[in-house]
Amino acid sequence: MVEVKKTTKTKSTEEKAPKITKATKEKTSDKTALKAKTPKTKVSDKAESTPKKASVKTSAKAEKINVEKTEKVEKVNVEKVSIKRESSSKDVQKADFSNIKELNSKIFEFEKNYDQAIFDCILSERASRRQGTHKVKNRAEVSGTGKKPWKQKGTGKARAGSLRNPIFVGGGRAFGPSVNRNYKISINKKVRLNALMASLFALAKSNSVLLKTFSLEKPSTKDLVEELRKINASNLKRILLVSDDKNIFLSARNLKNVKVTKVTSLMIEDLVAADLLILSNENIKYLEGLIK
């Protein structure tokens, strides 16, 4: 009997032991799984929840920014349109100067376009304005001794014969500009005439030529401005007035948008840059004489 009890006890212990280990293992595994899952799920929930909130905020902000941008763009466009309208009204309505019927001269019938001739003439006009009075001293004119600075050999330095050499500080200038240099560029008469006629035709085509004779009793800038205001030309940027009257020349000296010149000294650059050319019938006759 005793032996049987012992065997039963051992059996029961052997049977109970594995059951406890399995349960504990399952429980521990479940606990570890839960522990491992819980923080990850929390982090994932946070990570999933935060971008959603951020996306809503960013979308709302983006919508606000887009609305503000569209409003700004609309405002800017309206301002630009208004500026354009103002500029068109200020540009003195070039269509008002369309006196093509009065411009029956051969000068304004020169339909050929000589861009290269105009370019060459402008270059020659600009070059002729250069005085060429620049001057620098060469090695013969600069002050200094003519003594050899150090002996030819034995010093380890490069050989030198004079301290007035252009390589030294205080030496003369090598190949510097000389006195009274002539910068003029010669242009053929036919080329200049073609450029003149082409520029006049371009002004007539754009309705920028006005036939009118200006005359003032005395030099007065105020009176000249009034005369220009009568023809709606006071707001133009560049007005080229061809006249021999000294009073008009003195009256226009203080006006930055008006240039007075004689017919004999018309420049191609002034004609190309002019918004309005004011001529008299006498000036047209002189220009017609150049064509013959």
From Swiss-Prot:
One GO BP: translation
Disulfide bonds: none
Domain of life: Bacteria
Membrane-traversing stretches: none
A GO term from the CC aspect: ribonucleoprotein complex
Gene Ontology molecular function: any one: rRNA binding
Family statement drawn from the similarity comment of this UniProt entry: Belongs to the universal ribosomal protein uL4 family.
Function comment: One of the primary rRNA binding proteins, this protein initially binds near the 5'-end of the 23S rRNA. It is important during the early stages of 50S assembly. It makes multiple contacts with different domains of the 23S rRNA in the assembled 50S subunit and ribosome.
Subunit and partners: Part of the 50S ribosomal subunit.
Entries under NCBIfam families matching the protein: rplD_bact (TIGR03953)
Protein name: Large ribosomal subunit protein uL4
